[in-house]
A protein has these predicted regions:
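Charge-rich, solvent-exposed alpha-helical interaction surfaces
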Residues: 10-13, 17, 33, 57-60
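Generic structural signal for hydrophobic core residues of well-folded globular domains
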Residues: 18-21, 34-38, 61, 65
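Catalytic phosphate/metal-binding cores of nucleic-acid and nucleotide-processing enzymes, i.e., regions
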Residues: 27-41, 45
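Short, charged early-sequence alpha-helical segments and their helix-coil boundaries
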Residues: 40-68
């Protein structure tokens, strides 16, 4: 079983990036754009990545540099 304590740090990081990079988008809009980008640009099905890889992809999509 995956560590249930992973969800809040993941969600906090996602919320921080969302509010800093795309504050005008609704969550559904942001996720739709991200999922399409993953599919078309990265050739990845977003169903499969664990949270670490998901966040790496999300940061790349949002243009977040390491250390930001």
């Amino acid at each position: 079983m995956r560590d249930p304590n992973r969800t809040y740090p993941f969600c906090r990081e996602l919320a921080t990036i969302w509010s800093e990079k795309y504050p005008d988008l609704r969550f559904g809009q942001l996720m739709y754009n991200f999922i399409v980008w993953c599919s078309n640009t990265k050739k990845r099905d977003i169903f499969f990545p664990e949270e670490k890889e998901f966040m790496e992809l999300f940061k790349e999509f949002c243009g977040v540099e390491e250390g930001e």
